[in-house]
Amino acid sequence: MEVLMAERANLVFHNKAIDGTAMKRLISRLIEHFGMAYTSHILDQVKTLGFQQATATSISLGIDDLLTIPSKGWLVQDAEQQSLILEKHHQYGNVHAVEKLRQSIEIWYATSEYLRQEMNPNFRMTDPFNPVHIMSFSGARGNASQVHQLVGMRGLMSDPQGQMIDLPIQSNLREGLSLTEYIISCYGARKGVVDTAVRTSDAGYLTRRLVEVVQHIVVRRTDCGTARGISVSPRNGIMPERIFSQTLIGRVLADDIYMGSRCIATRNQAIGIGLVNRFITFRAQPISIRTPFTCRSTSWICRLCYGRSPTHGDLVELGEAVGIIAGQSIGEPGTQLTLRTFHTGGVFTGGTAEHVRAPSNGKIKFNEDLVHPTRTRHGHPAFLCSIDLYVTIESEDILHNVNIPPKSLLLVQNDQYVESEQVIAEIRAGISTLNFKEKVRKHIYSDSDGEMHWSTDVYHAPEFTYGNVHLLPKTSHLWILLGGPCRSSLVYLSIHKDQDQMNAHSLSGKRRYTSNLSVTNDQARQKLFSSDFYGQKEDRIPDYSDLNRIICTGQYNLVYSPILHGNSALLSKRRRNKFIIPLHSIQELENELMPCSGISIEIPVNGIFRRNSILAYFDDPRYRRKSSGIIKYGTIETHSVIKKEDLIEYRGVKEFRPKYQMKVDRFFFIPEEVHILPGSSSLMVRNNSIVGVDTQITLNLRSRVGGLVRVERKKKRIELKIFSGDIHFPGETDKISRHTGVLIPPGTGKRNSKEYKKVQNWIYVQRITPSKKRFFVLVRPVVTYEITDGINLGTLFPPDPLQERDNVQLRIVNYILYGNGKPIRGISDTSIQLVRTCLVLNWNQDKKSSSCEEARASFVEIRTNGLIRHFLKINLVKSPISYIGKRNDPSGSGLLSDNGSDCTNINPFSAIYSYSKAKIQQSLNQPQGTIHTLLNRNKECQSLIILSAANCSRMEPFKDVKYHSVIKESIKKDPLIPIRNSLGPLGTCLPIENFYSSYHLITHNQILVTKYLQLDNLKQTFQVIKLKYYLMDENGKIFNPDPCRNIILNPFNLNWSFLHHYYCAETSKIISLGQFICENVCIAKNGPPLKSGQVILVQVDSIVIRSAKPYLATPGATVHGHYGETLYEGDTLVTFIYEKSRSGDITQGLPKVEQVLEVRSIDSISMNLEKRVEGWNKCIPRILGIPWGFLIGAELTIAQSRISLVNKIQQVYRSQGVQIHNRHIEIIVRQITSKVLISEDGMSNVFSPGELIGLLRAERMGRALEEAICYRVVLLGITRASLNTQSFISEASFQETARVLAKAALRGRIDWLKGLKENVVLGGVIPVGTGFKGLVHPSKQHNNIPLETKKTNLFEGEMRDILFHHRKLFDSCLSKKFHDIPEQSFIGFNDS
């Protein structure tokens, strides 16, 4: 005691609170100095002191001790304000759902963390002896984050899936939770009693599995004689000293350590604190230590490889059951881990980035060429710099240079004024070692019914080419235009005026109009009507009987006609994009039997005509043949000059043959009968024989004409032709007979020894040689066709009086459908058309404007005076930007009457089919409307824009719009483009000034010409009125829409938003029809803010907007559904894929340990590992030759994966402050990595492929057999490792008892009872315990060791050289692949 007193006088007094960690350090120092007994004596005194003090203090805890932090109120208010702004941005479509989620999480997380940090200083100042404050530090129960929930705020919770619930709990437990908050906290809080119980059972099961793997590992020897070790390096300061010393203390050195030439530590020396400190100060070379990994034995471990026993600081005793200790020391902290709270909310804790702040106030400048715009992960605009960027901040007197590292985000613009400490850049956090990233899908669902539009191109995902999954290539908005299919008989608001073309949009063919209501409004007379219909969805021809009623109210004249859902049930008169005009013409008078023919007007599927396209064709019945034959153009080739440019490829629907344009007035058709028979059929006639009419050719085929039979055998079929005509055996003198295949005009004399006669008609001479010596001539009859030129077109298409140039021209061209000498085959009694009269579309090229390359055509139906007329409308398209259409309205001068008798000399093309009232029942009406022509003052250009779908509407010119002067000048220069930059087509998001540059629409004093067609006198009356409105084609982009697209929406069940506006001269916002407008865009001066939507109607003083909801989507998002599709509330719109950092938090910690130990893939590293394993297994044998190759490849792979597994498990525990010695984890990892899988190739007779054996056993067997055994490394999980041990009794007592025992019995396995568990099961003595060493015979040991060491040393030497040779290779691999290992710098392989 006196000694103690004497020492006490010299001791230093530390006035510090001592906590758990300090206490641990103190005890370990005490044991170092004084030994165990003395230390326990000292600790007893400390304990007594503590109990005395605690009794005296008498801490009590009442609800009054919970003091709320005063700053909480405004902090929460601030966070709420931020999330409100965020919500607004989301509504405007500026940020998408994932960005919103991230940002709100960060807002609330920051608030909650700030409160937590404020808590302690606050307590310290106001009430330092507050029991809550004291308890939160004691470490006994409760910690800062739990107290924070009592007095701070609970903040964000996460649901059982670990997803964040973005409704923060703002109250703390002192203030009391609201009902919602209570439910959320029950849902997401993982601190319930149940949870603890579940976690405890998990940890218990983990312990059981761990012990199962390693229960047989016992310390059996002092030294296994290995020369290998793992090198740990203290240099670079990369590894924290604490971890470094923890790794080293208690280990045994595998090699001597030199400082220069002086040896400071020898091999097999245990490392204590002093030695570690010396290493740290000297920064010596890498230190090679022995670990359980390097121990040479399979089923036990030696004292030196294990190191010191953690209980009493000496080398571990022989007979110590270190396996069970290891299993328990890993599993037991699991129960501690589970009791940790879920304080961070689980997600997004690793997502905070470092900020660069401005050093002083000033103007910021940087080189804009080095950055490109991007979005931050919160959706804010920013610049991304790809290389180092120097930013200069100019304050009044000084220049500051700030260097911004690559891959950083710049949050300010060039020349912007920044204040001191303002965040100017965000540095992307490097790859954080602690947090694994995982990809999460987030689905966005629609809030309302509506029609989907998007404002950019989308790609189809390749595997869903025909599905509805689209990938977005760039950031864009998706719009849901409100308004669903109409289900009820509501009173709708109509915004259509007289003669507008519109769709009735019913889902079925029946609709009844019940009542007409007329309402007077201040603006104008709005017509309201109600309609109900039955939602029958079958495709059937509707009953049109009640559709003739025209509903009139005042001056409005609205006629509705239904359109069927889909095109399957259309009447035969109108096929898809094809219109046939029946023509009862000349032929019908001559021959009643000929089928009636008609003009077919065909529009390509996409509705676009190129120059010289064929618009319509007429198949003249005179040029129709029933039989097969051959076409010839004439006797001499000059008749058939075919110029290249006159060859027009016909882009039809059915036929794809080229057409030959004829410059000649006649051609010839040589008939023949052709039968194509299968190769197996038996013919009843021979080649070159002559048959009569109706001769039997095969069993079920008879000839139609008589004549000469020719049989040609092709590969799989027989072609049999019958030529009618005369057979002529020529004499020596006949000249003509030398020619073959010539046409002879009439009047040519033909001499013969027997007869002489004049040829009456054209004939065709063909020479036939049945054998070498004989030949004869076949004279075949020829049918001659004359082709007459078309009638002059000028009279048929009266030129448009208002049109002065850029006229669309139509010319008639006759095409022969078959080339010269082409055989024609008739298939089963169909008639063959030889000549087709075609109407070719062409137009003048305008020199000033860009040439029109394509024209868009469609059919329009107009009802005038109770009759329905079809018009063909053709617009020319100048270029994608300016939409200047050309009008072609061939309102015919020759209308056909029904009997067709007076139409004999009218060219068929001038007629446009018109219906009488009686025919309305049969016809299927298209949407109705009118064609309007726009002219400008100088009559220089016009456009034809039709109001086609109900989503479009009219637009009026704006009065007193202040144009920019630039635009005025451009109008003067180029008066040809009055409509600038296109009228925005529907479905295209025309830019809005706040986001992008604005598109302008300019009109000046145009007049509208409406053409009324009156059927009674067939006069064209023009009515010139002041321009009232524009109409706009839905397909501003000149693509024909999908034919079923305009079916579903009812145009009136929409939400309208009316806005009267007087333009702000400042913003000079010019609205184009079909433009999408976001909510926060100011359009009107002092007008109310708009709802988001699409402009569908523009009047002089107001616009009508169809409400729409924007959703922002970023690249890589998947869009579900098709463009224009109707969606219902709750349908999935978009799926985002985003990365979130998985929490390093411990509630996910225990499962994470389990994942690592069961070797389930937790992130991409496992994939890399497997590839590396394969790579090593391939390249090492190549370097080293076969025998050593597999072994070394396997060894290196195993060593690498072992270290990585140990580090991963340690990370989880260390992040929670739980200390576990590495060697425990190493023993477990060694067991799950010590097996190899015998592979198929090189099958040896020892092991069967697919068998799992120990690595060392494979190595020994290979050496004994002196042949290579092919195997590859496997990582077994702990469960699989438990089921693959030496002992079947231990396996059976773990899992799958029946299976294991049955297999063992069948295989005749022997259990040597080496482990603990087998002996416990059978009630034997367990072969462990520190008194066990007396049983081992010393003589045996001595005999065994030298032999083994010789062999291994030989091997070790080779291995060492190889390893040093490949050390560099390894290091590079390591740094690349294992980026998540914090100790990467000091791991090498050392085999000294």
From Swiss-Prot:
Cellular compartments annotated: Plastid, Chloroplast
Record InterPro entries: DNA-dir_RpoC2_beta_pp, RNA_pol_beta''_euk, RNA_pol_Rpb1_3_sf, RNA_pol_Rpb1_4, RNA_pol_Rpb1_5, Rpb1_funnel_sf
Free-text function comment from the UniProt entry: DNA-dependent RNA polymerase catalyzes the transcription of DNA into RNA using the four ribonucleoside triphosphates as substrates.
User: What EC number(s) has UniProt assigned to this enzyme?
Assistant: 2.7.7.6
Instruction: Give the family this protein belongs to, as stated in its UniProt record.
Output: Belongs to the RNA polymerase beta' chain family. RpoC2 subfamily.
Q: A Gene Ontology biological process annotation?
A: DNA-templated transcription
List UniProt keywords, sorted A-Z: Chloroplast, DNA-directed RNA polymerase, Metal-binding, Nucleotidyltransferase, Plastid, Transcription, Transferase, Zinc
Name the gene: rpoC2
NCBIfam families, sorted: rpoC2_cyan
Primary enzyme class? transferase
Protein's name according to its UniProt entry: DNA-directed RNA polymerase subunit beta''
